[in-house]
């Protein structure tokens, strides 16, 4: 008999980050899953993921993880006295979640623990208020995120229409405790690249992590741009206009408020102009940018300064002529604004053939 499976579809960024965090734990613990536009997991992966999240924190992040009592990430998600009940009974029951037509989830199709199992859970519950415990699993509230309460409750519209009144299901309430694992540390805060496609989300965040191994100081614009470029080169797939428009970076920042003298957590959003996204996701354009392999040229494209590519090529041709005549190229030469390998004759010769083609393809792509 084949094992039952759960299909997870993209939703708001907090939910998507929870799914990606779950996948990181499953991958680390060598538990299989399917990922395309949606994610498919075996029901048994739920219990394995709960055991796995503690292992992941200990072995990968080198820190202890907790969801009970006054922990730093999900304060009072459960009480300390409920720890054994949650692990041995509640998470086990989560493996049997099913769609319930009588209950609503605002984020997914709605996966709830069946009523007959809830009755059994109540008998095992270590406390008096079982209905209160379950109510916490069916409503989006402060236990579901760490240190972001003020940011979300004060400006709910900036949180993709998330608010405290919306109902969520037992599975979504569980997935949220994985969301912090999806965020990547940068010099500008922790980031998560979100999109309406789980494979795209998974790939872009992987590429972002790889990019940051080269330099932790890259700004968010460059991290996103480089991730899109890598995706275009490695996947060679076309994305629809709607998908492109909905690629964004969620940024978690800590800001010191001089008035209250407290450090506050805020949520910010970043995306690239649509033309830039369209350009970077074009395989032929991305390949030419990769072949040039010059950050200064990439920065011009990210900034939308396409006409400067013509200017850059003019200085490349002048530099080639100087090198042919064995003339010295000074550090103040205009070409140094565009290239670091400005003394490499063969490189400049190659680039002189690429830049005009790149410029024309960019103009074609954006319809100029």
Roles of regions detected by a PLM:
Residues 9-15, 50, 56-57, 89, ...:
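Histidine (H) residue identity feature
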Residues 29-30, 53, 57-64, 68, ...:
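Short, flexible helical or helix-coil boundary motifs
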